[in-house]
Amino acid sequence: NGAYTSFLGPQPLYLLVVVFLTSLGTWGLPQMVGKFYAIKSESSIQKGTIISTLFAIVVAGGCYFLGGFGRLFATPEQVAANGFDSIIPSMLSGLPDILIAIVLVLVLSASMSTLSSLVLTSSSTLTLDFIAPLKKKNMTEKSKLSVMRIFIAFFIAVSAVIAIVQAKSKVTFIAQLMGISWGALAGAFLAPFLYGLYWKKASKASVVASFVFGVGIMIVQLMISLGFITVSGGFLGLIFKNSLYSGVFAMLGSLVIVPVVSLLSKKTVPVNTDAMFSCYDRTVEVHATTALSDKKN
């Protein structure tokens, strides 16, 4: 069926969906914004671009070859019985103990760094942008810190519960779980982040619409994955085929919804938008070592 002879495999559309979800979806993850706050100068951007590109090549190339050579470690019968997620453990079982330990440490470090950035971003957003404005009295820094710690513990507990429930449910495909989480986050945040940075006409109503659309699509997908709702055939059948398809649809749909709703709700555009964008018009003098180009005449 072309699985071993075609460069794109027997399902090129599915491959395209995975590429969209893992590349375009990264733009819309809220925790990624925090990483840009740590940029020291424009010269750091230049170095980071080279390092991240090389890292992306290693990761993408490694994943591609893992998929290509995975068939050597698992037969179709084993995959049918244990699922695709059993291929990587089968490959690791043949490695020496020291290499298995290194792989486990790398996986745990990546998982913990993602979890920490997510819970920190979520707890600070809820505390500073939602709870603090609702308080009649100004919250002290100590009380804000206490509330953030409570949210951090709560989100970690929720993550543990989800992991336990997932281990005992029929939704065991890791990529589909990633599709639900990334689809909800990127579907909600991607368009507001992108248009908010470069387009003055982005409105508050469009941001709300993007949030409702992205999260709503993935909630429906979650209900379908858990078996509470059934969808088959036609356009809806394609969108909700699995969480990867619906995640990409949520992201691409939000890119259309935000400009359309913004043009229909011009009254909800913040009044100080011009003042916000004026920072791009001001002249800034910096040392040559911090400029984008470090070339000396």
Where are these regions (language model features)?
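Membrane-embedded helix-loop-helix hairpins and adjacent transmembrane boundary segments
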Residues: N1-N297
